């Protein structure tokens, strides 16, 4: 391996996935290990205490296995990248402590990674996407539009005023007794349903801006369920289809507004990147693709398996930061909240 090629170990423990990966600056994945904690399914959502203990139990062995699979040693690693926030603080502490231990023992640089930045940058591992671009993050914890000017340089255009979109998928699935996580099963059920069965509220779509509000949609679904004495599979499919159709309409409306806002700020912007767990939904992808095309925008998604949390995106974000010499001191602390727009705000917009 040429010396100019950078190799980064990435560690992700912000929620209920324990993940480790080794990637390089040639955009190659040398190893990737991920363990999705099934313990949360019976609770219909992530239990922070259970997640933290699972990371403690699994992360060390997963890291060793990842290094062995890559056929490298720690001496071949140029830096350690670790999610430092935002996320569940217990899990973040576990990942950060392991990463700091590796960095301390090896003398390698450590890079604290903003989890949302990792979602934002992972598409650049697969496509040639130059800055600036418009970003939509739709995940279990976040729902927001940002302009990405560079690594570490973001400008927020809008966000959810209440629930994140992924959270609403999970809560609707829980109401319908479909299990956790809710996104994949609602998408599957919607294929057999009638999307015109129920009229659901499309909050804020009559207004300018690109903020979201999903609390009314969640309440409307709950009311429909409560008004039916018997919940059969047909009703579940119809509710799922109507819900997903409503979400698609909201996304299209908000994307139209966000594109107009981004172009007014910077005329160079002609690309939309959509990432986060909800971005794996095929039907919503099709809706957003048509919307972007109607606005003469190119749209990009990460591979579906990398829309949800993973170690590859942390490793790649580490590469993006390392090539700019953005490394961290060992005394940083994990952060439950860490807005993207607060990163290196003094970087010049190139």
Swiss-Prot record:
It comes from Ehrlichia canis (strain Jake). Binds 1 Fe(2+) ion per subunit. Fe cation binds at residues 115, 119, 309. Its cofactor is Fe(2+). One of its GO terms (molecular function) is N(6)-L-threonylcarbamoyladenine synthase activity. Belongs to the KAE1 / TsaD family. Required for the formation of a threonylcarbamoyl group on adenosine at position 37 (t(6)A37) in tRNAs that read codons beginning with adenine. Is involved in the transfer of the threonylcarbamoyl moiety of threonylcarbamoyl-AMP (TC-AMP) to the N6 group of A37, together with TsaE and TsaB. TsaD likely plays a direct catalytic role in this reaction. This is tRNA N6-adenosine threonylcarbamoyltransferase. It catalyses: L-threonylcarbamoyladenylate + adenosine(37) in tRNA = N(6)-L-threonylcarbamoyladenosine(37) in tRNA + AMP + H(+). The gene is tsaD. InterPro entries: ATPase_NBD, Gcp-like_dom, KAE1/TsaD, TsaD.
């Amino acid at each position: 391996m040429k010396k100019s090629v950078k190799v980064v170990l990435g560690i992700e423990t912000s929620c209920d996935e324990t993940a480790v990966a080794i990637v390089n600056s040639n955009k190659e994945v040398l190893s990737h290990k991920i363990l999705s904690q099934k313990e949360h399914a019976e609770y219909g959502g992530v239990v922070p205490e259970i997640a933290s203990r699972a990371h403690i139990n699994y992360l060390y062995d997963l890291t060793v296995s990842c290094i062995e699979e890559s056929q490298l040693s720690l001496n071949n690693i140029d830096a350690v990248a670790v999610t430092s926030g935002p996320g569940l603080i217990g899990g973040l502490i576990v990942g950060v402590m392991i990463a700091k231990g590796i960095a301390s023992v090896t003398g390698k640089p450590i890079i604290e990674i903003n989890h949302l930045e990792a979602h934002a940058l992972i598409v650049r591992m697969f496509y040639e996407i130059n800055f600036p671009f418009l970003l939509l993050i739709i995940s279990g914890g976040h729902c927001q539009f940002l302009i990405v000017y560079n690594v570490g340089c973001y400008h927020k255009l809008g966000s959810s005023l209440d629930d994140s979109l992924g959270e609403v998928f999970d809560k609707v699935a829980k109401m319908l007794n479909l299990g956790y996580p809710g996104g994949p099963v609602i998408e599957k059920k919607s294929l057999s349903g009638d999307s015109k069965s129920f009229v659901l509220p499309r909050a804020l779509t009559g207004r300018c801006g690109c903020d979201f509000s999903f609390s009314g949609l969640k309440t409307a679904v709950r009311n429909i369920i409560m008004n039916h004495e018997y919940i059969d599979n047909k009703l579940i499919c119809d509710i799922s289809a109507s819900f997903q159709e409503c979400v698609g309409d909201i996304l299209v409306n908000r994307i139209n507004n966000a594109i107009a806002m981004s172009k007014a700020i910077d005329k160079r912007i002609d690309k939309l990147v959509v990432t986060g767990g909800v971005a794996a939904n095929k039907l919503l992808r099709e809706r957003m693709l048509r919307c972007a095309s109607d606005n003469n925008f190119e749209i990009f998604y990460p591979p579906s398996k990398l829309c949800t949390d993973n170690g590859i995106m942390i490793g790649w974000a580490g590469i993006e930061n390392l090539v700019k010499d953005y490394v961290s001191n060992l005394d940083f602390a994990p952060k439950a909240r860490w807005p993207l727009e607060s990163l290196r705000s003094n970087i010049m917009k190139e």
